[in-house]
């Protein structure tokens, strides 16, 4: 039965973490590729296929979250190539890419290549603003922007990579200002932190980004 197949393919360990999730955590690209190909070749309903590819742990965190958090760019790209097989709807792909806190962690940790890889996967989706807004409007539960954390930690190249993703889409002026302001929970913009820290490189990069978006 499909339920039996689902249980076997999920390969959940003693810690309630699916095997695919562990592969994302550890950056095992070849395993992700092999597993994804098996999932697409196995006769499953779309919701069961979605369940397996999300590979969520016991805290409901998907495998892609851990790849972003840990900076496994090649794993993210491999996942993107699997999603690009045209066997999933845009809505299903969007569900698999809803890893806001993962992108937040990638910005905070300065995982530039991982963010670039995620941006490449987004190109699979139609460029509807509601899709992109939902995936890139990144704040933690207390309201601090992921981009603010990149400023806070001086991750200049990471800021550039994320803003290059924004350039691929047409945002309203108001939304773009909100995103680029990169505020924390108190409304303090990220560039303010760069000024306080005398982070000249990040300030200059931010000025270039603002100029490009005018």
Predicted features along the sequence, with ranges:
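Conserved ankyrin/ankyrin-like repeat signature
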Residues: 4, 30-34, 74-78, 114-117, ...
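Ankyrin-repeat inter-repeat connecting loop/turn
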Residues: 9, 52-53, 97, 134-136, ...
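Ankyrin-repeat boundary/linker signal
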Residues: 11-12, 53-56, 100, 139, ...
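Residue-level signature of the C-terminal ends
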Residues: 26, 38, 42, 82, ...
């Amino acid at each position: 039965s499909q339920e039996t197949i689902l249980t076997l393919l999920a390969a959940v360990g003693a810690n309630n973490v699916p095997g695919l999730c562990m592969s994302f955590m550890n950056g095992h690209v070849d395993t992700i590729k092999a597993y994804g190909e098996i999932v697409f070749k196995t006769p499953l309903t779309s919701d069961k296929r979605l369940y397996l590819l999300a590979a969520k742990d016991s805290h409901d965190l998907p495998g892609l979250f851990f790849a972003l958090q840990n900076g496994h760019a090649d794993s993210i790209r491999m996942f993107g190539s699997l999603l690009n097989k045209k066997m999933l709807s845009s809505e299903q792909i969007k569900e698999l890419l809803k890893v806001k806190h993962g992108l937040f962690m990638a910005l905070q940790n300065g995982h530039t290549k991982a963010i670039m890889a995620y941006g490449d996967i987004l190109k699979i989706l139609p460029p509807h603003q509601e899709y992109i807004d939902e995936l890139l409007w990144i704040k933690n539960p207390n309201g601090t922007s992921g981009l603010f954390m990149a400023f806070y930690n001086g991750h200049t190249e990471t800021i550039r990579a994320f803003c290059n993703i924004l350039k691929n889409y047409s945002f309203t002026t108001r939304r773009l200002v909100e995103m680029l302001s990169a505020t924390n929970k108190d409304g303090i913009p990220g560039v303010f932190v760069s000024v306080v820290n005398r982070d000249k490189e990040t300030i200059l990069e931010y000025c270039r980004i603002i100029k490009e978006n005018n």
